[in-house]
Structures are given as C-alpha cells and as structure tokens.
C-alpha cells in the first residue's frame, strides 16, 4: 500500500476580489456545479493567488506571516487597479476569470513571496513560470471534453471589470476547507 508523504498544506496567500465580482463568479460556480457536477475549489473564497498553498512549519504561526507582510510588503504601496477580461482555461482542467497580467501583479507577487520566505525560510518557493493572475471558477473535476462549450457559455457573460488590488489575504486550511484567516488592506493610491 502506497502512503502519501506529501505534507498537508496549511496556508496560501492571495488577493480577495470585491463583493460584486465575487457574486458574479459564485454564480458561475453554481452553474458549473449544476451543469457539470463541479465542486472542487468551490468552498474557497474567490481570489487571485499570490503564493500557492504551502505547509507552514510548526515553529511558525499565521501571526509571523501577518508581521512579514505588514513590515515588508504594505509599506511599499503596491496597490493598483487590475482588470478582468472574460474567461479562459488552463487546458481542460481549470476554468478561470482572466485577470490581465502586468508588472504590478508580478511585483506584488514577488514582494509577497520574498516577505514570506524571509519570515519562514524554506516554507515555499517562487514559481519559475511567468505569473498568470487568475480567479478560479472550477478546477480538477471538470468533465473531459466540455471546456470549449463551457468557455463559450461563460464568455457570453462578457465579464469585463476593473477592480482594486487593495488587500493581501492569508488563507488557512480548516479541515478540508480554505478560509480567509487574515486580510491586510492597503490603499491603491
């Protein structure tokens, strides 16, 4: 019998989206659940991930992450206005609201990763791929072969929205769910 030796992920860092966009994307999740039975990721608040899930070593706590972001990221005034341009997908596996990538997203991600690694060395690592910000609607349990139709339906919604990137949120695993543990707000001006 094979045992899973992957450490249980405990935290990730992201940006919560405004309530109006969150409500629209929650409607999309409900559609994916009703039409295709999708449930994966639907319990997680709508967000853009900056630092993917990682296991925080026992000698550290969420408070250490909060302090690192307050000390090393918030003073840099990295808030900005972002833009969603409809929907896209990573293959057949992940449907997302297409957040337009730019240097402001990359800088916010890089500074956040650096702060987390300074506070809790080795707990995560910077992704080597170019940063593609996105707000996941459904993932992992989308039936094979339906993504083209799903994208056609979703893109008929013409989701085109500006939104403020005005927070960094630390998500914590509670049982089998991710919850917003702490949200650190900042100005976009």
PLM regions with names:
Residues 1-81, 102-161, 167, 177-189:
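Basic, often amphipathic N-terminal segments
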Residues 87-90, 165-178:
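Glycine-rich beta-strand-turn "strand-cap" elements at beta-sheet edges
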């Amino acid at each position: 019998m094979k045992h899973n030796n992957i450490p249980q992920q405990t935290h990730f860092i992201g940006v919560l989206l405004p309530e109006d966009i969150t409500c629209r994307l929650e409607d999309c999740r409900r559609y994916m659940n009703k039409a295709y039975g999708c449930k994966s990721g639907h319990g997680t608040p709508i967000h853009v991930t900056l630092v993917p899930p990682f296991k925080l070593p026992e000698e550290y706590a969420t408070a250490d992450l909060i302090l690192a972001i307050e000390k090393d990221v918030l003073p840099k005034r990295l808030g900005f206005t972002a833009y969603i341009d409809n929907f896209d997908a990573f293959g057949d596996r992940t449907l997302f609201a297409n957040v337009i990538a730019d240097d402001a997203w990359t800088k916010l991600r890089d500074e956040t990763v650096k702060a987390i690694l300074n506070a809790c060395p080795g707990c995560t690592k910077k992704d080597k791929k170019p940063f593609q910000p996105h707000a996941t609607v459904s993932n992992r349990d989308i039936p094979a072969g339906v993504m083209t139709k799903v994208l056609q339906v979703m893109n008929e919604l013409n989701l085109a929205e500006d939104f403020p990137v005005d927070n960094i949120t630390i998500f914590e695993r509670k049982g089998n769910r991710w919850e917003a543990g702490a949200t650190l707000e900042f100005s976009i001006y």
